[in-house]
Structure formats: structure tokens, C-alpha cells
UniProtKB/Swiss-Prot annotation:
Function as written in the Swiss-Prot or TrEMBL entry: Microtubule-associated protein with the capacity to bundle and stabilize microtubules. May associate with chromosomes and promote the organization of mitotic spindle microtubules around them.
PTM info: Ubiquitinated. Ubiquitination by FZR1 may lead to proteasome-dependent degradation of this protein.
Record Pfam families: NUSAP (PF16006)
Record family assignment: Belongs to the NUSAP family.
Gene name of the encoded protein: NUSAP1
Annotated spans, Disordered: 44-123, 148-207, 252-294, 308-338, 396-454
Main localisation: cytoplasm
One biological process term in Gene Ontology: mitotic chromosome condensation
Phylogenetic placement of the source organism: Eukaryota, Metazoa, Chordata, Craniata, Vertebrata
Oligomer status and interactors: Interacts with DNA and microtubules. Microtubule bundling is inhibited by IPO7, KPNA2 and KPNB1 while association with DNA is also inhibited by IPO7 and KPNA2.
Protein name: Nucleolar and spindle-associated protein 1
Domain notes from UniProt: The KEN box is required for the FZR1-dependent degradation of this protein subsequent to ubiquitination.
Modified residues (Phosphoserine): S152, S265, S272, S292, S299, S334, S375, S386
Domain of life: Eukaryota
Species the sequence originates in: Bos taurus (Bovine)
Residues spanned by motif KEN box: 407-413
Length: 465
């Protein structure tokens, strides 16, 4: 797609701007002015990026030209007569000449005696030689640092084709000494940039490698389960400590005479006493079992959770279900006492109406007979004792209705009132309400039922229709 210039964008229609934004991957459902601004900003950014890329390509091309210039200067230095040079500069090894070549060289020097300016040239070459070799060494070190995959460069040897060097060049005699320079060139020309610089061209990442790395970082299912178990263990042990701290060691209520039969509450029946006796221990034991054997599951059934202050008014109500935080005041349990020594205070209150029924219990109390003597007489109501005992219900607050004013039966006056009402409002007839309709239906059903029963018993002769 051809990207328009910034001036052309002003003449575009809104639909064209939207299509352009969609093609560029921008948000298209904006207002016209905002969309135009966003497109201009995006195009400016793209143009700036392109300019930066071009500058980098130019710099990389110039950096590629530098090694070419160096290699060409080396070639020129090699082409010049180097008869007087017997040793290479820097770390290079000595060049041993064969006697034939030495003789030829002597003959040539005798024939061609170099003039004075040539000596100056030689001195210039000798002076320039070390600087060039130093630059070359630096360049080689850089290449060796950046390109690890490239093998170590073989030792170069300056000289003619018939010179033999000791080392690798002695084995590979056919190799050209200028091969490493080509390798260096290829290092730079392939990437179009120096090895130190990063490429700005966006490449697609290898998602497989990324996913594998992420997957290796993730913990396995077994590790996750172990971590969760440890977490639940700590949580459960903390909750158990809280529950044990919240349980107050309550004192037993002093023994009082039994109230009248009418005032016997649901909580004081023998069955409920048995339930309340067994319940705190059962609750504690279940908590312990859950804490030790099954740590991974949290049980919220026995926990007393108060979310707000709105539940405080229910504290004085004695519910049948005893949570760990709110137990019945009649049960006296101590944490240090064993299971057999748990004594119920309500046993002192209990007397049987007729004969005492023998109940088989695992822990029979022997001191019960001395505290509450069994009598066949009718118990006498004690007002003070009943008033001192806590109530099992919430008492009524506020004004009571006046005593003696009962609701009168107005069914006799209903017809008269209705007639008078209709006389007053004859111009606006009142619609039948639902309550009146219900009463009418109930009356009709009653009459129908009586009629059917009368026909069945032969009291009313069935009308033939």
C-alpha cells in the first residue's frame, strides 16, 4: 500500500482515513481530528525510523570500505621490492630465503643499485610498517572477540611465492596469504554493520524458544500441590490456635430448684442435654482430625465468622448449634480435664416428673443423687430462681397493646357499612378488592361442599339439570 504524505492526508475523507488507519494497525474509531493527528504522528515516526536506518546502512558501508583500503595498502607494500627486509614486524616469524633466491637477489641488487630517493622511500616504508602492523593487530583482536565461530586466523607471511614459512603455511603451501583479509571482509559485508552495533531491522522472534524458556520457569503440578498443602497446613494450625484461644473456661451455674413444667425450654430437655454434652467434644475432635489427617481441605462449618457489627445483638440468644466461640453457659468444660471428668451443670437442674428413668451412659455420675434428691411431689415454682436464670428468647421491647381491648366481630355491621358506603359513593362505584374476592370464593366453596355432603347423606335431593 502506498503511504500518502502529510499534505495529502488533509484532503482525505473520513472513510479513507479510517481505512488507512486499519491498514497501518491503528485505532480507526476515533473522531476525524484525532484520527488525522494520530495518522500524522505515526507517519512522522515511520519517516524518522527510515532515515535512521539509512544512516546506519551508510555508516556500515563506510566501515566495510575500511578493511578494503587496508588490504589494498598491504598489497602495494608487498609488491614493492622487499629485498632488504629479512624479518617481519611485530609478532610474525622470520622469513628464510633459499640460497638460489638470495643469489638472484644479489645479482639484481648489483644490476640495479637503488638511488638516494629510493632509500628515503625504504625508510618511509620501514616507518610506516610498524604502524600498519599495529592497526592490523588491533583489527584482528576485534574480529577474534566478536566472531567466536570464525577460526583463528593463520599466520601471515610476507614474501614471494617460492618462500617457505615454518608453521601452518609450511603445510598448506598453496594457500594465498591474503585469504584472512577476505574472511574479515565477509564478516562485515554480510551484516552491513559493525559487529558491535545491533541490527535495527525488526525480526520475528523464535516463539518456540521463548515458550520453552517460559515453560521451564513454570513449576510442575507436584510442586504446586506441595506448596498448596503447606499453605493449608499453616492456615489450619493458625485457625486451631485461634479457636482454642477463643474458648473461654466457663463456670457452672449454681444449682437451683427446677422450674414449672410450662417453663421447660427446648435447651433443657434430656435429649438436648445429651446433644449439648457430646457436641463440644465432638466439635473439638473433628477439628483435630481435620487438622491432622486432612490438612488440604478447610472446613468453615464449625467456624464462627462475624462479618459486621450487626450480629452482636444475637450474642445473648442461646442457639442450639454451639459454635466454638459461643457455647452454652450450662456446660462446664476445662481444657486440661480428661474426657471422663466433663461435668454438666444442667444435671443439677434435672428432676423427673414421675419415676426416674435409668439412662445407660458411658460416664455415670455418682454425685447426682446427693445434690438433687428425687421426690415424687409436685415441684413448687420459685420466682426468684426463674428470674435469675437467663431467658431463652429475646424479650419484647417497646409499648404493649392495652389489655382487654380485643378485636370485635364486625361481620354483623359489615353489610350495613357497605350499603352506607355505596350510598355515599354511588357516582364512583368502588371496585371489588382481592380480599373481598377471596372471601366470596371461600363462601362459595363452603356452600358447595355442604351441598355435596347433604346430597351424599340424602338430606338434600339433588336437582336435576
Amino acid at each position: 500500500m502506498i503511504v500518502p504524505s502529510l499534505e495529502e492526508l488533509n484532503s482525505f475523507k473520513y472513510s479513507d482515513l479510517q481505512n488507512l488507519a486499519k491498514s497501518l494497525g491503528l485505532r480507526a474509531n476515533l473522531r476525524a481530528d484525532k484520527l488525522l493527528r494520530a495518522l500524522k504522528a505515526h507517519l512522522k515516526n515511520e519517516a524518522r525510523k527510515e532515515n535512521e536506518n539509512q544512516d546506519e546502512i551508510q555508516t556500515s558501508a563506510s566501515s566495510c570500505d575500511e578493511p578494503e583500503i587496508q588490504t589494498s595498502s598491504q598489497e602495494q607494500a608487498e609488491r614493492e621490492p622487499d629485498d632488504h627486509v629479512t624479518k617481519t614486524r611485530g609478532r610474525r616469524k622470520t622469513v628464510h630465503r633459499s640460497p638460489d633466491s638470495q643469489a638472484n637477489g644479489n645479482v639484481q641488487t648489483e644490476k640495479k643499485l637503488p638511488p638516494v630517493p629510493n632509500l628515503q622511500n625504504h625508510s618511509e616504508i620501514k616507518l610506516c610498517g610498524p604502524t600498519k602492523s599495529q592497526n592490523q593487530e588491533k583489527h584482528e583482536n576485534q574480529v577474534l572477540r566478536t566472531a567466536v565461530e570464525v577460526p583463528s586466523l593463520p599466520n601471515e607471511s610476507q614474501g614471494d611465492e617460492n618462500t617457505v614459512s615454518s608453521g601452518k603455511h609450511g603445510i598448506d603451501g598453496n594457500e594465498d596469504p591474503r585469504v584472512p583479509s577476505k574472511r574479515k571482509k565477509s564478516l562485515y559485508t554480510d551484516g552491513f554493520s559493525k559487529p558491535g552495533k545491533n541490527k535495527t531491522a525488526s525480526t520475528t522472534p523464535n516463539f518456540k524458544k521463548l515458550h520453552e524458556a517460559r515453560f521451564k520457569e513454570m513449576e510442575s503440578i507436584d510442586q504446586y500441590v506441595e506448596r498448596k498443602k503447606k499453605h493449608f497446613e499453616e492456615h489450619n494450625s493458625f485457625n486451631e490456635l485461634k479457636v482454642l484461644q477463643r474458648q473461654p473456661v466457663t463456670k457452672g451455674v449454681p444449682a437451683t430448684p427446677v422450674p414449672a413444667r410450662g417453663r421447660l425450654s427446648v435447651a433443657c430437655t434430656p435429649g438436648s442435654q445429651r446433644r449439648s454434652q457430646g457436641r463440644p467434644h465432638a466439635g473439638r475432635s473433628t477439628l483435630c482430625v481435620k487438622g491432622s489427617a486432612k490438612r488440604s481441605a478447610l472446613s468453615a462449618a464449625k467456624m464462627n465468622v462475624r462479618f459486621s457489627a450487626a450480629t452482636k445483638d444475637n450474642e445473648h440468644k442461646r442457639s442450639l448449634t454451639k459454635t466454638p466461640a459461643r457455647k452454652s453457659p450450662h456446660v462446664t468444660t476445662s481444657v486440661n480435664t480428661p474426657k471422663g471428668q466433663a461435668v454438666l451443670g444442667t444435671h443439677k437442674l434435672k428432676t423427673t416428673r414421675g419415676e426416674s428413668v435409668a439412662v445407660i451412659t458411658p460416664f455415670k455420675l455418682t454425685t447426682e443423687a446427693s445434690q438433687t434428691p428425687i421426690s415424687h411431689k409436685k415441684p413448687v415454682f420459685d420466682l426468684k430462681a426463674s428470674l435469675s436464670r437467663p431467658l431463652n428468647y429475646e424479650p419484647h421491647k417497646g409499648k404493649l397493646k392495652p389489655w382487654g381491648q380485643s378485636k370485635e366481630n364486625n361481620s354483623l355491621h359489615e353489610h350495613v357499612n357497605r350499603v352506607s358506603f355505596h350510598k355515599k359513593t354511588y357516582k364512583q362505584p368502588r371496585l371489588q378488592t382481592r380480599e373481598e374476592q377471596r372471601k366470596k370464593h371461600e363462601r362459595e366453596r363452603k356452600e358447595k361442599k355442604e351441598k355435596v355432603l347433604g346430597v351424599r347423606r340424602g338430606l338434600i335431593i339433588a336437582e336435576r339439570s
